[in-house]
């Protein structure tokens, strides 16, 4: 009964605000007008107003424009629009009466100016995919935001997506990074430490890795040698296998020697493969999350050490690309 009464009070409050918005509507074309109610502000934006501007004014955080947009079902505001600004943040987890929110994590590997292959995405295709995200109203969020969502600490925009790149190919620096910067998208690069400065392959060097980090790219790890952590090799004893796991993961955490002054928090499994022993090692070593290449989006209740990622192959057109962007599930939680 208490919950029903609370919903009724909230409903009455919103109806009062909507009526207020109708009365304020005549103020369009002049500076923003607003009226404050418990938990909400009724706003009719003036000339030049934006969602981020409203968020800065009423929520004290311009990055929370998405909260206003999600609440009102809009991507932008125009003078004369009738907008409700919720003063309380949405609950974490994205659970509604219709289902629950999911966050897709995209996985790229290598890029090329003119050619594509299974693991190589052509520059024009990558740029078209980033433009598609913008045009369709997706919000590209950081890995830290994703983990806060998974840990039920903070909400994320309703159409959130994460971008990751594996290995450490030079094309990340030459091709992907400029495009990501142009769109203002955060992204994470999972590097194999032994792959950097490799004279036999076209890979990044440590100066370029540092420059990527300085430019805003999150640098995380993909082990030292890209070996399969979940399988022992032929003739390998249990003791040797344990030592190899420890060496692969400890080497990956030796950030200081590369001039990258912070500890890593996340691992991308080579080949997406993991198991209980590998996860136990990660937990004991303080990793906060780890990523597979199992295709699918992630609800807040996903195992943080088995986070799904969808590999974007070089032959994907925009229809195939879009199939990897599910941001809501109507399945019942049981």
Regions found by a protein language model. Give the residues of each.
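C-terminal motif of bacterial Sec signal peptides marking the signal peptidase cleavage site
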Residues: 24-26
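N-terminal pre-catalytic segment of deacetylase/amide-hydrolase enzymes
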Residues: 32-34, 81, 87-160, 316-318, ...
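N-terminal secretory signal peptides that target proteins for export/translocation
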Residues: 1-11
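Extracellular LysM carbohydrate-binding repeats and other cell-envelope/extracellular binding modules
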Residues: 30-35, 53, 60-98, 307
């Amino acid at each position: 009964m208490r919950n029903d009464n609370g919903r009724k009070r909230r409903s009455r409050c919103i109806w009062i605000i909507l009526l207020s918005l109708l009365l304020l509507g005549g103020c369009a074309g002049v500076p923003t007008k607003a009226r404050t109610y418990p938990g909400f502000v009724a706003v009719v934006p003036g000339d030049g107003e934006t969602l981020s501007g409203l968020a800065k004014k009423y929520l004290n955080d311009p990055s929370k424009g998405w909260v206003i947009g999600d609440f009102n079902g809009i991507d932008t505001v125009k003078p004369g629009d009738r907008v409700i600004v919720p003063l309380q943040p949405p609950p974490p987890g994205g659970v509604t009466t219709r289902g629950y929110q999911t966050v897709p994590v995209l996985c790229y590997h290598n890029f090329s100016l003119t050619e594509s292959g299974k693991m190589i995405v052509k520059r024009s295709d990558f740029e078209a995919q980033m433009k598609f995200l913008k045009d369709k109203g997706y919000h590209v969020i950081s890995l830290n935001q994703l983990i806060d969502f998974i840990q039920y600490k903070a909400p994320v925009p309703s159409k959130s997506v994460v971008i990751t790149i594996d290995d450490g190919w030079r094309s990340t620096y030459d091709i992907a990074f400029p495009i990501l910067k142009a769109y203002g998208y955060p992204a994470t690069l999972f590097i194999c430490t032994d792959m950097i400065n490799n004279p036999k392959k076209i890979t990044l060097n440590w100066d370029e890795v540092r420059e990527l980090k300085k430019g805003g790219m999150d640098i995380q790890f993909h082990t030292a040698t890209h070996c399969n952590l979940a399988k022992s090799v032929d003739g390998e004893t249990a003791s040797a296998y344990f030592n190899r796991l420890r060496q692969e993961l400890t080497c990956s955490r030796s950030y200081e020697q590369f001039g990258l002054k912070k500890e890593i928090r996340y691992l991308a499994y080579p080949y997406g493969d993991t198991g209980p022993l590998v996860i136990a090692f990660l937990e004991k070593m303080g990793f906060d999350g780890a990523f597979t290449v199992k295709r699918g989006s992630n609800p807040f209740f996903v195992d943080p050490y088995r986070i799904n990622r969808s590999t974007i192959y070089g032959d994907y057109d925009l229809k195939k690309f879009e199939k990897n962007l599910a941001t809501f599930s109507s399945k019942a939680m049981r």
